[in-house]
Swiss-Prot record:
GO terms for cellular component: plasma membrane. Glycans are attached at residues 565, 569. GO terms for molecular function: citrate transmembrane transporter activity; succinate transmembrane transporter activity. It is a multi-pass membrane protein. It comes from Caenorhabditis elegans. The chain crosses the membrane at residues 14-34, 54-74, 124-144, 205-225, 253-273, 323-343, 350-370, 403-423, 441-461, 485-505, 520-540. It comes from the Eukaryota. It is found in: Membrane. This is Uncharacterized transporter B0285.6. Belongs to the SLC13A/DASS transporter (TC 2.A.47) family. NADC subfamily. Keywords: Glycoprotein, Membrane, Transmembrane, Transmembrane helix, Transport.
Length: 574
């Protein structure tokens, strides 16, 4: 037995090194199948490394810069700019703004204030957390949003559940947000939430709360075009495929398309998760008068929320300043090119000023605007006191310590792969194969099949990687069968955000999984049904509201011009 244990130990120790060598060796035959095969080799090798996590994700993101030039697919001069392309700068701006929000604790104030309005009954508490989380996720990345909201949800669960887990401690007052404070490690261990010592119902509430935070952060990311990697990859692809064309996609038009189904995605998650862990009786209970026990629980939760909110004190200068800069940045994105009326970007030379420019102005302000009210002489009561220079809202030391550069590199790799898939002809080859299989089917059925493939794939790789592969394919498929360019590409951009099933599918899932309140099987069982609901909602939206909004019943002139320009350059299968 000891020997077998030793071999297992050895295997676990050396598996990363072994896989680093074996994965490219196994895939090496692809190198003999032209540019398409070489591109597939790079993508599959990266996917193997991503799934197994044999090296950090950020390091794996360097592979396109190494492999694509060496294999003669794309030159380094073309690959390198993808890592800090215009679209990636927009995402950089969003992350910097979210860092400023986190630094001044504005997100915490917004979350707790909204919770005071939605109530503390379990149904409405969960709904409230979903609404708050998805709202925040509209403006920042799903990973950052979940990282901000999961500790708040967990701390609230600790406040409500620990007294039930340890009846002898009921008389003790437990401060709500201890998770954020420095405290004695032994004391913290004593107060640690252990769901195995709770009733089935209370354990279910814990699972619901944490899963819904992860789901809401992913769902909220679908609502704006700048908030998540797949949406940005879609935006980058449509601008590359149809440069200087009025394709109808803007910050405002995307919100008009995406917000209505986002509400249905959230309701589906709220309904499925509670049905799974608490049962239909619990759901029906929202319409009856609460029992005395439930009233006591609600009172505990209400006190916890208000206590946390009161501890924040009055709104600080830093919070007000960050909120104003954040709102101005969002307004600049919404109004730059609203399509329905001329935007402010029309004041400048066409193509010179984009959303990244206005976002960088906001980021620049964060580094020069003071964290505290300026200490000007005219504001001081004591004129004899010397002036004090105030620190900015964020400084570079804060960025160096806390900025998630790995996400920027991961997204940059996604852009590089997406471009390589298009340039190498791999997108044409795969689209051709799919087209020969499903071309005789109605467009509606083709759209659903493509959505299912994307949603399944995104559970086993990062959402940016999935989007970077399938979005170029979706454009080629639309061109091949004569469908509107957005008809297949938009569901392909939305689908990677439906990675609800596995912890490794997205960092948001990993964050809530690490709280130990949920198991892998819990995620999978809920995720399967939620994926089905979300695919159905997307299909209905694409063939009703979005169909009208983007005028998909008519093949657009810009797509016709593009198809004409590409004649002779396309794959022979078309």
């Amino acid at each position: 037995m000891g020997r077998r244990h030793g071999w297992a130990d050895e295997f676990r120790t050396f598996f990363p090194t072994l896989w680093l060598i074996l994965a490219p060796l196994i895939l090496s035959p692809l190198l003999f199948f032209g540019q398409e095969g070489k591109c597939a080799f790079v993508i599959l090798t990266m996917s193997c490394y991503w799934v197994a996590e044999v090296v950090p994700l950020a390091v794996t993101s360097f592979i396109p810069m190494i492999a694509l030039p060496f294999l003669g697919i794309v030159s380094i001069k073309e690959v390198a700019p993808k890592y800090f392309a215009d679209t990636n700068i927009v995402f950089f701006n969003s992350l910097m703004l979210s860092l400023a929000v986190e630094e001044c604790q504005l997100h915490k104030r917004i979350a707790l204030k909204m919770l005071t309005y939605v109530g503390t009954r379990p149904h409405w508490l969960m709904a409230g957390f979903m609404i708050i989380t998805s709202f925040i996720s509209l403006w920042i990345s799903d990973t950052a949003c979940c990282a901000l909201m999961a500790p708040i949800a967990y701390a609230l669960l600790e406040e409500i559940m620990i007294p039930k887990m340890r009846p002898e401690e009921k008389e003790n007052e437990i401060e709500v947000m201890k998770i954020f404070d420095k405290e004695d490690p032994e004391e913290k261990e004593k107060k640690k939430l252990d769901t195995s010592r709770l009733s089935v119902r209370d354990r279910g509430i814990c699972k619901c709360m944490m899963l819904l935070v992860a789901h809401a952060s992913l769902i909220g990311g679908t609502g704006t075009i700048n908030s998540t990697g797949p949406n940005l990859i879609f935006r980058d692809n449509i601008e590359k495929n149809f440069p200087n064309e009025d394709h109808g996609i803007s910050y405002l038009s995307w919100m008009a398309f995406a917000i209505p189904p986002m509400i249905f995605y959230m309701f589906s998650s709220w309904f499925i998760v509670q049905l799974q862990f608490l049962g239909p009786r619990h759901l029906m209970g929202m319409f009856r008068e609460p029992t005395e026990t439930e009233k006591q629980e609600e009172e505990v939760a209400k006190r916890a929320v208000w206590k946390s909110y009161d501890q924040l004190g009055p709104m600080t200068w830093a919070e007000k300043s960050t909120l104003v800069i954040f709102v101005l940045a969002v307004l600049s994105w919404v109004s730059s090119d609203p399509k329905v009326i001329p935007g402010w970007s029309d004041l400048f030379r066409k193509g010179y000023v984009t959303d990244s420019c206005s976002g960088l102005v906001a980021v620049f302000l964060l580094f020069i605007w003071p964290k505290k009210k300026p200490d000007f002489r005219i504001f001081r009561k004591d004129k004899s006191r010397p002036s004090v220079r105030q620190e900015p809202l964020i400084d570079w030391d804060c960025v160096r310590r806390r900025f998630p550069w790995s996400i920027i590199l991961l997204l940059g790799a996604g852009f590089a792969i997406s471009d390589a898939v298009r340039v190498s002809g791999l997108s044409s080859l795969i689209a051709c194969s799919l087209n020969s299989t499903i071309s005789k089917m109605p467009f509606f059925v083709m759209q659903i099949i493509l959505s299912i493939v994307v949603v399944v794939m995104t559970e086993f790789s990062t959402n940016s990687a999935t989007a970077s592969i399938f979005i170029p394919i979706s454009f080629k498929m639309a061109e091949a069968v004569g469908a509107h360019p957005l008809y297949f590409s938009i569901p392909t951009a939305i689908g990677p955000s439906f990675s609800f099933m596995l912890p490794m599918a997205t960092p948001a899932n990993a964050i809530v999984y690490e709280t130990k309140t949920i198991r892998m099987i819990d995620m999978v069982s809920c995720g399967v049904f939620l994926n089905i609901f979300c695919i159905a909602i997307t299909a209905i939206n694409m063939n009703t509201w979005a169909f009208w909004l983007f005028n998909m019943g008519t093949y657009p002139d810009y797509a016709l011009r593009h198809a004409t320009n590409m004649t002779g350059n396309s794959s022979q299968c078309f």
